[in-house]
Amino acid sequence: MPSRFIPHFSNILSLYTQIKSRWQETDILIENRCGSRYRGGRFLISTAPQIKELCAWIESEHLKLRIAFDIPQLYTAHQVTPKRSYEICALLEELKEIRQYIGGVHIWGKRTSHSRRISHCGDLNTYFNNDMQLKAAFLDSLGRLFSDNQVRNLVLEVNSHSEDLCSIIEDLNKAGVSYV
């Protein structure tokens, strides 16, 4: 059992037990995070190895917890940039072994404005700097990651236009990602 999670999650396990005993069908998800602007401390679950470690702990404790998989945050944690774009697909492939623990997908666009990248704006075209080959490779990898016929919760955080939101949904549909 990965001991580094015990001090952080043991405090909330009693709350988890209370919720699950009263509302058995409730899905509880834990999201990975890696914020460059967050100043309140370090996140426990940011990288692919940390996500896999958490899933091993969930399994060892026989918990019905799952992951809300924030894909852009994973890329931030691994410092994936357009120059290191080969890692985009490799990271998704690496997480295939724990996909049964992924209960939700958090995805958003990103676009350039006044020489800096703005999160939660734009669609996947602008997220990948209009590199359609890279976007297609990402969507293909995402489709393979989730080719297990499991329906997942979809959390889209797009603060720009509804066209951007619809564009992301259309891309996910084309990739064969099943979601609610």
Regions found by a protein language model. Name each.
Residues 5-7, 28-31, 65-70, 103-107, ...:
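Hydrophobic faces of well-ordered beta-strands that scaffold small-molecule active sites
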Residues 13, 17-20, 96, 143, ...:
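A structural alpha-helix within SAM-dependent methyltransferase catalytic domains
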